């Protein structure tokens, strides 16, 4: 074999070897590009929507829906327990990417970048079993317990138009546990909140509490991003949630 042919063969082998190295080095990079992105989801203790189970793991309706929806979009949700009154500061400071915790869209349509609605919820009122309160009109002059910065608080403070009577006092609590404890101990005459939350609690002790038949308000639940951010993701998430309704996931 001539020297020229040997040289040509060596050059061809060198090109193939170099190409192989480039392909090998590119594979991890490609894998990294397709790896799920992490998105930080702020949630509150709001059983049965979001809470910590006995093993300290995040659980609940919203946790399951968020995990499935973001997975379909190529994201891995990182759930972060937050203080509900601090939610807006955490969102604007970038400590969380979104709020997904039985959050009502109604009356807040222009305050956030929304995805949804994905579910509907009624506000209800619960009282002690022996209470003389039988209807919403009987709440006149009574002491009401609500969780701070919730739709129920806005309703009873008169920030939202409703047929509720004027009450004696609105007591706002940081957590639902504190709110429910206040009713149990007689510090308030009634409490108000999302139907699923109140029903889950009263069903555990039906002999001690009951829920009024009338509902003061119905609302749409959505996922809130900071206003002016994540517009594309919010639109994609809205479509994904709609797909989940159609396929029976929701």
Spans of model-derived segments:
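C-terminal motif of bacterial Sec signal peptides marking the signal peptidase cleavage site
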Residues: 19-23
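Bacterial signal peptide processing site
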Residues: 25-28
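Extracytoplasmic small-molecule ligand-binding "clamshell" domains
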Residues: 31-102, 172, 236
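Periplasmic-binding protein-like
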Residues: 43-45, 120-127, 195, 199, ...
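Ligand-binding cleft/hinge of the Venus flytrap
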Residues: 52, 66-75, 152-173, 202-206
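Extended ligand-binding regions for polar small-molecule ligands
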Residues: 63-72, 133, 137-138, 142-143, ...
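Acidic, polar ligand-binding/catalytic clefts
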Residues: 67, 76-138, 209-215
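A ligand-binding cleft/hinge motif common to bilobed small-molecule-binding domains
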Residues: 89, 101-111, 155-158, 182-218
């Amino acid at each position: 074999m001539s020297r020229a042919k040997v040289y040509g063969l060596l050059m061809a082998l060198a090109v193939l070897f170099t190409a192989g190295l480039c392909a090998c080095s590119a594979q991890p990079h490609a894998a990294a590009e397709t790896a799920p992105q992490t998105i930080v989801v702020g949630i509150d203790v709001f059983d049965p929507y979001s809470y910590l189970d006995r093993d300290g793991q995040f659980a609940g309706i919203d946790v399951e829906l968020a995990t499935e929806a973001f997975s379909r979009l190529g994201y891995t949700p990182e759930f972060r327990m937050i203080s509900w009154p601090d939610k807006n500061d955490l969102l604007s400071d970038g400590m969380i990417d979104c709020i997904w915790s039985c959050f009502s869209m109604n009356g807040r349509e222009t305050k956030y970048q929304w995805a949804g609605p994905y579910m509907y919820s009624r506000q209800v009122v619960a009282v002690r079993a022996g209470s003389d309160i039988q209807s919403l009109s009987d709440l006149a002059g009574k002491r009401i317990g609500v969780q701070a910065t919730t739709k129920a608080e806005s309703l009873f403070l008169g920030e939202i138009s409703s047929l509720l009577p004027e009450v004696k006092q609105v007591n706002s609590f940081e957590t639902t546990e504190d709110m429910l404890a206040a009713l149990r101990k007689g510090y308030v005459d009634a409490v108000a909140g999302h139907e699923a939350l109140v029903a889950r609690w009263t069903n555990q002790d039906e002999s001690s509490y009951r829920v009024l038949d009338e509902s003061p308000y119905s609302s749409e639940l959505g996922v809130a991003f900071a206003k002016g951010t994540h517009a594309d993701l919010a639109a994609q998430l809205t479509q994904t949630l709609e797909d989940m309704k159609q396929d029976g996931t929701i």
